């Protein structure tokens, strides 16, 4: 006989969510694979036109006309659907936090078509749009199934996970991204549904693009232990450069707002500036995966590496600041690869065997992304899956940890959270539904909730703690129920109050804040 006050977790609930996750993953895999394929084909075509224009300049005039028309078209899309601006990841985070509301179908088709800005050669990535496309599909599935708000958010999460998985053939990174970057917690139903969706979407993507890893660099030798000390120095460099990236990216509106153009036509700037870049250096166009892949065959001269880094840093900022649909994942990884190649070449001058330069390319990609996104687990696993090698988990972890600490000491914040805060400050279309909803709140090791009775905590108003998920059990709560580390608190509230209540519980349960009150 079961203990009083406990509800047995039925296996069919998990199966129910797994099946929904598979459904979302299948649709997302198809849509994102078509999106990715369209961008690649368009990118190849654009590069070939620039190559031809060197001998027949009339083609450059044609490209200029196409860029102007594309800027008009994408600007019109952004004007009618502002939620497709940028990578889309801050919008998804805001949606899951209950701070933004979106029309999933409008976002889906306009974001897909708006991807022309990525295919046109701008220094933007496909991963952010892929995540938002997946999230839109998840939201649509939730409405199709007439799911309650809390279940719809799980499906949105699974869509985001499967979007990243299909974009990079990285299902584990897709799962970790949702848990580490978006939810900042571990919820059994979220990870189970998201994992099912990510695996399914990745299978579809592999069918389209084959089994070869996206950034396969060939055989990568294991880095000898004697070079691990140099990883600390590399981590410091990555942390500092990541902090600079954050500051410059967040300062871009100060530049664009001075232009005599409406915000939705800021894309004219990158669309016009891409013309001389495409004419002079067509191989540098796009998110940068071709540059990373080039390191698998040969090492570039240091002066060329520095030139490429400056070019890609500056124009990736200009591209993203224009408010066009496009992400920063791949551009960040490309910049990290250039930093790693530069550092590896310096190490060769100090006597290191050149065969290890590729190791530093891989390590720096993860470290630089960690410094900017403040999501080390996602960065490590993402790079591991993209290069197809498990030989570098230890050096990846070391460099990522140092880069994270250095960026933290400098005062850097996770870039997507900063972008979301800016979006919420400027967003005029955000709408709160005001519907009843539940959300999960984890009890962590650094929380004062650990070991506390429910009645002894000063809970916010307008909420109800309805149950606690502990392992596979769901416990109905009462005043004497003791909360423990690892518990997931299931809280009922109105969606309009959700962000405030989350923040209030976090503030009141923080050990740091508790100590400061004494």
Where are the regions a protein language model picked out?
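Alpha-helical transmembrane segments and immediately membrane-proximal extracytoplasmic
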Residues: 1-424, 428, 444-445, 470-473, ...
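A short, polar/charged loop/turn motif at coil->beta-strand junctions and beta-hairpin connectors
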Residues: 86, 112, 435, 459-462
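A structural signal for short secondary-structure junctions
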Residues: 361, 372-373, 433-435, 459-460, ...
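Long, charged amphipathic helices and adjacent flexible linkers at domain junctions
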Residues: 415-438, 510-518
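Short, glycine/charged-rich beta-strand-loop motifs at protein surfaces that mediate ligand recognition
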Residues: 439-443
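Cytosolic Rossmann-like ligand/nucleotide-binding regulatory domains
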Residues: 444-501
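Short, compositionally biased
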Residues: 480-481, 501-518
């Amino acid at each position: 006989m079961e203990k009083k006050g406990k509800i047995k977790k039925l296996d069919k609930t998990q199966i129910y969510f797994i099946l929904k996750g598979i459904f979302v993953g299948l649709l997302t895999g198809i849509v994102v694979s078509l999106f990715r394929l369209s961008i690649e084909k368009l990118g190849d075509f654009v590069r070939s036109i620039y190559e031809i224009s060197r001998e027949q300049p009339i083609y450059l005039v044609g490209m200029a006309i196409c860029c102007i028309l594309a800027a008009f078209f994408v600007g019109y899309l952004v004007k009618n659907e502002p939620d497709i601006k940028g990578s889309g990841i801050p919008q998804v985070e805001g949606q899951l936090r209950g701070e933004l509301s979106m029309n999933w179908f409008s976002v889906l088709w306009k974001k897909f078509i708006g991807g022309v800005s990525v295919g046109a050669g701008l220094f933007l990535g496909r991963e952010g749009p892929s995540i938002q496309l997946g999230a839109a599909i998840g939201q649509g599935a939730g409405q199709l199934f007439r799911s309650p708000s809390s279940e719809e958010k799980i499906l949105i999460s699974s869509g985001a996970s499967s979007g990243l998985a299909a974009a990079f053939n990285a299902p584990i990174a897709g799962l970790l991204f949702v848990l580490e970057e978006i939810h900042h917690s571990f919820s059994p139903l979220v990870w189970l549904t998201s994992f099912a969706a990510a695996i399914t979407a990745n299978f579809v993507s592999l069918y389209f693009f084959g089994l070869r890893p996206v950034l396969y660099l060939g055989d990568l030798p294991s880095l000898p232990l004697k070079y691990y000390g140099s990883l600390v120095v590399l981590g410091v460099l990555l942390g500092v450069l990541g902090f600079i990236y954050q500051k410059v990216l967040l300062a871009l509106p100060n530049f664009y707002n001075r232009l005599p153009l409406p915000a939705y036509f800021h894309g004219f700037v990158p669309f016009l500036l891409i013309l001389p870049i495409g004419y002079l250096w067509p191989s540098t166009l796009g998110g940068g995966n071709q540059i990373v892949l080039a390191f698998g065959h040969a090492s570039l001269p240091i002066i060329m590496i520095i030139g490429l880094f400056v070019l890609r840093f500056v124009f990736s900022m200009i591209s993203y600041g224009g408010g066009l649909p496009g992400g920063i994942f791949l551009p960040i990884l490309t910049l990290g690869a250039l930093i790693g190649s530069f550092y590896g070449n310096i190490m060769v001058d100090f006597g290191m065997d050149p065969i290890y330069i590729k190791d530093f390319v891989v390590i720096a990609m993860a470290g630089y992304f960690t410094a900017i996104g403040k999501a080390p687990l996602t960065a490590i696993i993402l790079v591991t899956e993209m290069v197809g090698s498990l030989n570098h988990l230890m050096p990846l972890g070391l460099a990522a940890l140092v880069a994270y600490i250095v960026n933290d000491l400098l005062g850097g914040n996770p870039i997507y959270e900063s972008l979301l805060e800016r979006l919420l400050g400027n967003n005029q279309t955000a709408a709160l539904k005001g519907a009843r909803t539940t959300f999960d709140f984890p009890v962590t090791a650094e929380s004062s909730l650990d070991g506390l009775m429910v009645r002894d905590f000063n809970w916010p108003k307008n909420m109800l703690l309805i149950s606690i998920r502990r392992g596979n059990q769901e416990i109905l709560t009462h005043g004497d129920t003791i909360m423990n580390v690892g518990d997931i608190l299931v809280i009922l509230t109105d969606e309009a109050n959700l962000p405030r209540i989350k923040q209030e519980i976090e503030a009141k349960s923080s050990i740091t804040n508790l100590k400061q009150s004494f």
